[in-house]
Amino acid sequence: MTKVVGMATVLGPRPPQESMGPSPIKVEEDEEKDKCCPTLELSHKHFRQSGNQDTLEPMGPSTIKAEEDESKDKCRPNLEISRKSFKQFGYQDTLEQLGPSTIKAEEDDEKDKGHPSPEISRQRFRQFGYHDTPGPREALSQLRVLCCEWLQPEIHTKEQILELLVLEQFLTILPRELQTWVQQHCPESAEEAVTLLEDLEQELDEPGLQVSSPPNEQKQSWEKMSTSGTAMESLSSTETQHVDASPKYEFWGPLYIQETGEEEVFTQDPRKRQGFKSNPQKEDSADEHRSSEEESHADGLKRTVIPMIPANKYGSRSERQWANNLERERGTKASLQDTGSRKGAEPASTRPAPGEKRYICAECGKAFSNSSNLTKHRRTHTGEKPYVCTKCGKAFSHSSNLTLHYRTHLVDRPYDCKCGKAFGQSSDLLKHQRMHTEEAPYQCKDCGKAFSGKGSLIRHYRIHTGEKPYQCNECGKSFSQHAGLSSHQRLHTGEKPYKCKECGKAFNHSSNFNKHHRIHTGEKPYWCSHCGKTFCSKSNLSKHQRVHTGEGEVQ
């Protein structure tokens, strides 16, 4: 690069300009006396005293080269001649002689100061406001400048610019917390952003994962975020010294966040966060005063990888909110990993395919696709009815049946019978009417007896087979129906859950309670199809029907 020491030879005699006063070269030399190195000033003084300002031969090429090399790093911003200076002082014709290196000096100096990162340039372009400019034309011009600073069309190809736009749109459609997390890693392409997200999913899905990178790498990552335009600062020296004390570190559970008004602030020392495994002798005494609520929460969480986030390192509240949501989400996944570890530990090759029935009943051999259906099916063998109606005490083996039954207590009963009884469902009315008409579509093949319901036929068929699957644990007595076992067990416990609200009388079976309750209501649901007479119990109806059949007298 050509310096001022060689300017006299290149420029030649200055054009006559009487009004300009002192020589511009002299002015520049005087201004540079205090700024530039003393070696260069001595060389200028030597030339003026010798009177040989038109030649540089007395110094020799080696001396000139030495001065140029010596002053290259010290005086470069002050000695380079700009294009504006040549035009002002009449040396425009010598620009071609100086070459492109001197002319481009100012541009090189601007580059040395450092260009903003692509993310900062993008944010400047996107966040530029109309109120920042005096008018629309200035706003448009400024937008063009900011767009060029971001996309850099002078160095990027069309494909690279397209990739930048695709990357920006891809980050826009991501959830807020994932968007901020990916931006912190400064991906250069959409493919790199996808790779980062896939790696994050694997980390969250792998139980018991440990951090293997040393703390100094963590520090470098934070410093990289700071220089790349994120609103974060590098780790403080105090935090770095604490972290560097141990070669490896682990994290248990999520980061705990302290709420201060509306703002959420992370605990300042990462080693003080709940569950961080460190040397007990170096723990701060404040750790002993952690609330029992935090400790109980941390004990129930599975070990997981959580990035160390310094306190107050977020530049906006939205980023702090992102951190809160991200840690909360990770903590939720970690808490579920323990319950799902049995399934998660199972190899993918042994997992059931869709529609495959791997759950088999040990009693009858029936297969099911999931364990919940098998559990429901087993209740048909055990007779278990864990779902009890709080209104009438009726028990059911499935929650769905209880839900349907409970509606009869809450909603209207639009389906009425001639006997005055009402039902919430038409199917219940049909079953009830079979009692009046004595319709019995379900017939036993062994004895020919017919029943109005399929369940009644199944219970009756056990008389022929002698099956009594329901056994009392107290006395060992067996029953063919679960209702019989339930009634029998109340003899041991003395329980009488069915109590009449009218007179206070209690019963150990719902059928006895229903018969008694009809005394107060006057309900007579059983009526004779021959004469239309009604009765409050089925036994009374049977006795009456003997008159019509000739088997007995009317009671």
Curated annotation (Swiss-Prot):
Residues 18-134 are annotated as: 3 X 39 AA approximate tandem repeats. It is found in: Nucleus. Residues 210-240 have a biased composition (Polar residues). GO terms for molecular function: DNA binding; DNA-binding transcription activator activity, RNA polymerase II-specific; RNA polymerase II cis-regulatory region sequence-specific DNA binding; zinc ion binding. Expressed predominantly in the spermatocytes and spermatids of adult testes. It is also present at lower levels in the ovary, brain, spleen, embryo and fetus. There is a cross-link at K26, K302, K313, K431 (Glycyl lysine isopeptide (Lys-Gly) (interchain with G-Cter in SUMO2)). PROSITE patterns: SCAN_BOX, ZINC_FINGER_C2H2_1, ZINC_FINGER_C2H2_2. One of its GO terms (biological process) is oogenesis. Disruption phenotype: Male germ-cell-specific conditional knockout results in complete male infertility and meiotic arrest in spermatocytes. Spermatocytes show impaired chromosomal synapsis and DNA double-strand breaks (DSB) repair and a significantly reduced expression of DSB repair-associated genes. It comes from the Eukaryota. The keyword Amino-acid biosynthesis does not apply. Residues 122-204 form the SCAN box domain. Strong transcriptional activator. Plays an important role in spermatogenesis; essential for the progression of meiotic prophase I in spermatocytes. This is Zinc finger and SCAN domain-containing protein 21. It comes from Mus musculus.
